[in-house]
């Protein structure tokens, strides 16, 4: 491939991972965004989307030279919107160049004409002229600072240069220095991603105006929302150390992730064990975001789809761990988690010093503590990271990740957690995440049983179940979970999104957790009995909402 000469401001076609080439513009990255090591790359903002990324130079092509070629191979609606945004940007930039020189000439003529008409002939006229000149100077100073964000006539020139070439605008305070006129281009993009690639998330700030919005993004956002552009403020991720009332210290972090955006994947080799409802979605998102992944499952056929998508196949858990830097596992219960680590050709046989193991299974604190001890005893690093969510959230990369254990490993998993989830929390020492996950699922399982109980009570008392749902959706209990589960029940759709047998398992473990500290859990205990009845009715492999059937049989 012949070397391509590219520079700042060039329009390009950029290819990111498995996504098709997309039109973008080479721009300066934000100051706090480090350039990835390795091959030469440019920071590109993509037209028609809210994404930006570091793109390797070999994945970039000049826009105009390859325009026809790219349009032929991509016919999608969003792609066409992106191309339209490029053309609009070019049209506006061209119009700006033409009007800029015309305006400069008109300004000069107006100034000359004004001088001829304003020659002073008396003392009063001299005083008027003096006042007028003072106002003109003040306004000219303000014109350099005031660059309107709502203007549709923007080009590629800097704010300072545009202000010098255009006539003075509205009155205001003069600039203190030229630094006020230098606005990072990155402040114009809405909803940007967080993490190693983007390192921050853009959010609107109502108190500040947009100082200099990039025209093509301004055009796209207006065309989609029909609202004026607003300013976006960089918010860096923070780890917050919270001192609890008990005196113990827990480290918590809420890290926003790159939902539907671009992520710079870690250069570490990733392994993944367990391709069930949750694991399948997680692996799919890891691959989409460019991670190198080796997979294994007890059912070998489950690996085939991911091999086609670019994953590598591991023959045993031990082989996966020995060939990868960080290995994740997501299995059904404590017994499966132990067998995976301690069984024949298990994880423990592949552990070497500095090898990393992340258990994403929902298990009890004793189990995860035991696994951590045997991994660390071999020189490995351990992190527990159970996930809150369901199959759909897993597929969408919108899980909530609860992590505890090796803090450094948690940070090393950053790009992986961003690919698979919307938020991650670091909860301190091993066992904390397991306890928190069981409590979360205890609340969810109990709520689901209450929903089913309410729907059946409405039915037997002659009330409309749909009307009950409508009322609940208009009140304080309204949620996606409530609406989806009720709709599925009313439609008789119990396709598993979260297996009933697993929520019952989590209720059982949560009750045991309460017993261990002499804390009563009567609501969870009652819900657990209803789920046990549903299991007796052969509902184990249906969705948790099938607990409804325990009330009607």
Curated annotation (Swiss-Prot):
Pfam families to which the protein is assigned, alphabetical: NAD_binding_11 (PF14833), NAD_binding_2 (PF03446), PWWP (PF00855)
Role summary: Cytokine-like nuclear factor with chromatin gene reader activity involved in chromatin modification and regulation of gene expression. Acts as a nucleosome-destabilizing factor that is recruited to genes during transcriptional activation. Recognizes and binds histone H3 without a preference for specific epigenetic markers and also binds DNA. Interacts with KDM1B and promotes its histone demethylase activity by facilitating the capture of H3 tails, they form a multifunctional enzyme complex that modifies transcribed chromatin and facilitates Pol II transcription through nucleosomes.
Compartments (UniProt record): Nucleus; Chromosome
Source organism (scientific name): Pongo abelii (Sumatran orangutan)
Top-rank taxon, per record: Eukaryota
Span list, region Disordered: 92-188
Record-listed Phosphoserine modification sites: 130, 167, 540
InterPro entries reported in the protein's UniProt record: 6-PGluconate_DH-like_C_sf (IPR008927), 6PGD_dom2 (IPR013328), 6PGDH_NADP-bd (IPR006115), GLYR1_PWWP (IPR035501), HIBADH-like_NADP-bd (IPR029154), HIBADH-related_NP60_sf (IPR051265), NAD(P)-bd_dom_sf (IPR036291), PWWP_dom (IPR000313)
Keyword hit for Transferase: no
Crosslink (Glycyl lysine isopeptide (Lys-Gly) (interchain with G-Cter in SUMO2)) position: 135, 176, 179, 201, 211, 227, 237, 240, 269, 302
UniProt entry keywords in alphabetical sequence: Chromosome, DNA-binding, Isopeptide bond, Nucleus, Phosphoprotein, Ubl conjugation
Cellular component GO terms held in the UniProt record: nucleosome; nucleus
Protein name as catalogued: Cytokine-like nuclear factor N-PAC
Portion annotated as DNA-binding: 168-180
Site residues by UniProt (Required to promote KDM1B demethylase activity toward histone H3K4me1 and H3K4me2): 217
Chain residues that bind NAD(+): 271-285, 362, 505
Domain notes: The A.T hook DNA-binding domain is required for the interaction with MAPK14. The PWWP domain is a H3 reader and strongly binds DNA.
Region (Interaction with KDM1B): 216-225
TM annotation in the entry: none
Region of interest: Dehydrogenase domain: 261-553
UniProt keyword annotation of Nucleotide-binding present: no
Region annotated Interaction with histone H3, chain positions: 214-217
């Amino acid at each position: 491939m012949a070397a391509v000469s590219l520079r700042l401001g060039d329009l390009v076609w950029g290819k990111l991972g498995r996504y098709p080439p997309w039109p973008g513009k080479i721009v300066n990255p934000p100051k706090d965004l480090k350039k990835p090591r390795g091959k030469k790359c440019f920071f590109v903002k993509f037209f028609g989307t809210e994404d930006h990324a570091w793109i390797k130079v070999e994945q970039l092509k000049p826009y105009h030279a390859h325009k026809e070629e790219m349009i032929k191979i991509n016919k999608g609606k969003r792609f066409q919107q992106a191309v339209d945004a490029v053309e609009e940007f070019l049209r506006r930039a061209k119009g700006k160049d033409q009007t800029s020189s015309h305006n400069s000439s008109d300004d000069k003529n107006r100034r000359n004409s004004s001088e001829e008409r304003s020659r002073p002939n008396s003392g009063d006229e001299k005083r008027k002229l003096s006042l007028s000149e003072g106002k003109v100077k003040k306004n000219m100073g303000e014109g350099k600072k005031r660059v309107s964000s709502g203007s549709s006539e923007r080009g590629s020139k800097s704010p300072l240069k545009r202000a010098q070439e255009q006539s003075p605008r509205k009155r205001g305070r003069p600039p203190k220095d030229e630094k006020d006129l230098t606005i990072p281009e990155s402040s114009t993009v809405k909803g940007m991603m967080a993490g190693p690639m983007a390192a921050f998330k853009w959010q609107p700030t109502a108190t500040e105006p947009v100082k200099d919005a990039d025209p093509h993004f301004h055009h796209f956002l207006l065309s989609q929302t029909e609202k004026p552009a607003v300013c976006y403020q960089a918010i860096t991720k923070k780890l917050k150390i919270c001192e609890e009332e008990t005196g113990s210290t827990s480290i918590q972090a809420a890290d926003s992730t790159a939902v539907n955006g671009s992520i710079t994947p870690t250069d570490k080799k990733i392994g993944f064990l367990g391709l069930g409802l949750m694991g399948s979605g997680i692996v799919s998102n890891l691959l989409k975001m460019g991670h190198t992944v080796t997979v294994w499952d007890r059912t070998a056929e489950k690996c085939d789809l991911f091999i086609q998508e670019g994953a590598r196949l591991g023959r045993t858990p031990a082989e996966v761990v020995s060939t990868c830097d960080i290995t994740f596992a997501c299995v059904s219960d404590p017994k499966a988690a132990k067998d995976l680590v301690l069984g024949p050709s298990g994880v423990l046989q592949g552990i070497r010093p500095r090898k990393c193991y992340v258990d994403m299974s929902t298990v009890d604190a004793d189990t995860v503590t035991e696994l951590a001890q045997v991994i660390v005893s071999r020189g490995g690093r351990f992190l527990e990271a159970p996930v809150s969510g369901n199959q759909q959230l897993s597929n969408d990369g919108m899980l909530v990740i609860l992590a505890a254990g090796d803090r450094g490993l948690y940070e090393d998993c950053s790009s992986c957690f961003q690919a698979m989830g919307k938020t991650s929390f670091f909860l301190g020492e091993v066992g904390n995440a397991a306890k928190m996950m069981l409590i979360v699922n205890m609340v969810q399982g109990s709520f689901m049983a209450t929903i089913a109980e309410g729907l059946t009570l409405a039915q037997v008392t002659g009330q409309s179940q749909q009307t009950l749902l409508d009322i609940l959706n208009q009140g304080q209990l309204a949620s996606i979970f409530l609406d989806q589960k009720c709709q599925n029940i009313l439609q008789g759709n119990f396709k598993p999104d979260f297996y009933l047998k697993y929520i019952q398992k989590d209720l059982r473990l949560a009750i045991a957790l309460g017993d261990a500290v002499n804390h009563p859990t009567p609501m969870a205990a009652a819900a657990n009995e209803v789920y046990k009845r549903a299991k007796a009715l052969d509902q184990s492999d249906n969705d948790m909402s099938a607990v409804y059937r325990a009330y009607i049989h």
